[in-house]
Amino acid sequence: MAEDTGTNNEGTGCSGWFLVEAVVERTTGQQISDDEDETVEDSGLDMVDFIDDRPITHNSVEAQALLNEQEADAHYAAVQDLKRKYLGSPYVSPLGHVEQSVDCDISPRLDAIKLSRNSKKVKRRLFQSREITDSGYGYSEVEAETQVERNGEPENDCGGGGHGRDKEGEGQVHTEVHTGSQIEEHTGTTRVLELLKCKDVRATLYGKFKDCYGLSFTDLIRPFKSDKTTCGDWVVAAFGIHHSVSEAFEKLMQPLTTYMHIQWLTNAWGMVLLVLIRFKVNKSRCTVARTLATFLNIPEDHMLIEPPKIQSSVAALYWFRTGISNASIVTGETPEWIKRQTIVEHGLADNQFKLTEMVQWAYDNDFCDESEIAFEYAQRGDFDSNARAFLNSNCQAKYVKDCATMCKHYKNAEMKKMSMKQWITYRSKKIEEAGNWKPIVQFLRHQNIEFIPFLSKLKLWLHGTPKKNCIAIVGPPDTGKSCFCMSLIKFLGGTVISYVNSSSHFWLQPLCNAKVALLDDATQSCWVYMDTYMRNLLDGNPMSIDRKHKSLALIKCPPLLVTSNVDITKDDKYKYLYSRVTTLTFPNPFPFDRNGNAVYELSDANWKCFFTRLSASLDIQDSEDEDDGDNSQAFRCVPGTVVRTV
């Protein structure tokens, strides 16, 4: 009987912890290859030639370098193709700062993230600068050579080492790929950037503008010292604009402007813009700079912004001649200051000033004060040829004085020609509001004034009845005496005299050219003066008045209102004035509401309604033959052409 296989005493002693497996050389059913020798042991001799450990020769080194160079070229070309699409992300202007556009403009917070405070050199750049990358929109070879010739040889510290890649292999590829013309182009652009870092950038832009357009920028503009001064027309010269922005600039500015004159030029700095703009609303230099910096994608200090010379014929001729050429884009209506200086007819008309036209304008607009005439007429210089001739004259003060004098003469003659009825109608036509007459009546009742007797006295006063043409309103302070009389005098277009000027011989001179008058706040001395020297005047008789620099004038006193805190009816020394002065007493204070506004409104519109409603009672009603309208022709002091009816 055969012996049992395996081990004896299994599970006893040390053998109890181990399982001994049998070594099997071949499994049942395994196929054996024909070319495999079953008797040969696996010693590893078949893997001897798998690793090539032979010495490296010179030919193999050149092959590896060539392979690395070809792979680096392929990678560099792929990166540049990707950058070509996204080159517009940072500043693409050649005037921009290269490090700023790469490090700061990609992200506003990128510049704050630093590992070292003193490190200024960037080890790796996300974007190459425009000048050293083949973006497809760079300068041509001719422009690059021209720029190098202008800027001269580069300085020692202006090299392009900071723009290369840091890896040794990539640095070699970068040096071999770029040609000599590209290196010169990068050097010229570096000189431009260094030039703009100088102290006076504005002077540099002025010089560059003259090189581009052949004339000085100051020949087209008048400088504004303040950036806050507003103007409607602006001349802007902008440098370093991307070509894609120039195509959309006109459409972007159309909603804001009424006129644009655009000129584009291309030089070594990129696109240069010269534009004359008329905005719909006046803007300051700061506002214009912010607007154009947003549209053009350039910094504000790369622009020259000033208002145009509107009085220069040379500047107007420049805009006119370039506007009709194909070098400019013009939209909107040409400004009037260009038309005025380029059309012969307008130029001849500006040299002729006519005083009669100025007087007619002042008369039609009720301007009799010299300062108002000078200011208002000067503002018409933009659209009135006679006003432009006035501004160009050296005798403006004389013309203003003569105009005011003639206008006063015409107004006084017109006023004296009218009766009181016509004058009230004339003054009422100047007021457009309807108004209400009841507040005036309510105020009189508040002062205990009977309305019917008041109308009778007012009727005699308006018509200048002798010894009835002076009404004195007396009473305590703050009862509304001056307010009531001032509102009435304002509506009737009267004058105001004051006893404070009584030391002068001419303090009664305003009565010569007045339809009605007011003497406000008459004191004891004023009543004494009137009782002594003005009895004939209050009687309604003619009286001679002394006038300054003129002869005495014989006049009849116009209807006169007097306000006073002195009641002359209670003093016997004024007994000679009792029959000459009609006295009304206002005993009650003037009422106000909680907000401090007058309870009874004494406005021009209310006085108009008062005289219109009570015209029959006051005997100032228009007659029936005048109801059909006024057929009289308006006053004209300018010789006009004959009106031909069709």
From Swiss-Prot:
This is Replication protein E1. Residues 449-599 form the SF3 helicase domain. The lineage of its organism: Viruses, Monodnaviria, Shotokuvirae, Cossaviricota, Papovaviricetes. SUPFAM superfamilies: Origin of replication-binding domain, RBD-like (SSF55464), P-loop containing nucleoside triphosphate hydrolases (SSF52540). Can form hexamers. Interacts with E2 protein; this interaction increases E1 DNA binding specificity. Interacts with host DNA polymerase subunit POLA2. Interacts with host single stranded DNA-binding protein RPA1. Interacts with host TOP1; this interaction stimulates the enzymatic activity of TOP1. Residues 163-185 have a biased composition (Basic and acidic residues). It comes from Human papillomavirus 13. Its EC number is 5.6.2.4. ATP-dependent DNA 3'-5' helicase required for initiation of viral DNA replication. It forms a complex with the viral E2 protein. The E1-E2 complex binds to the replication origin which contains binding sites for both proteins. During the initial step, a dimer of E1 interacts with a dimer of protein E2 leading to a complex that binds the viral origin of replication with high specificity. Then, a second dimer of E1 displaces the E2 dimer in an ATP-dependent manner to form the E1 tetramer. Phosphorylated. Sumoylated. GO terms for cellular component: host cell nucleus. Pfam families: PPV_E1_C, PPV_E1_DBD, PPV_E1_N. Belongs to the papillomaviridae E1 protein family. Its main location: host cell. InterPro entries: Helicase_SF3_DNA-vir (IPR014015), P-loop_NTPase (IPR027417), PPV_DNA_helicase_E1_C (IPR001177), PPV_DNA_helicase_E1_N (IPR014000), PPV_E1_DBD (IPR046832), PPV_E1_DBD_sf (IPR046935), Rep_E1_papillomaV (IPR016393), Znf_lg_T-Ag_D1_dom_sf (IPR037102). Residues 184-350 are annotated as: DNA-binding region. There is a cross-link at residue 556 (Glycyl lysine isopeptide (Lys-Gly) (interchain with G-Cter in SUMO)). ATP binds at residues 475-482. Gene3D superfamilies: 3.40.1310.10, P-loop containing nucleotide triphosphate hydrolases, Zinc finger, large T-antigen D1 domain. It is found in: Host nucleus. It catalyses: Couples ATP hydrolysis with the unwinding of duplex DNA by translocating in the 3'-5' direction; ATP + H2O = ADP + phosphate + H(+). A motif (Nuclear localization signal) lies at residues 83-85. One of its GO terms (molecular function) is ATP binding. The modification Phosphoserine is found at residues 89, 93, 107.
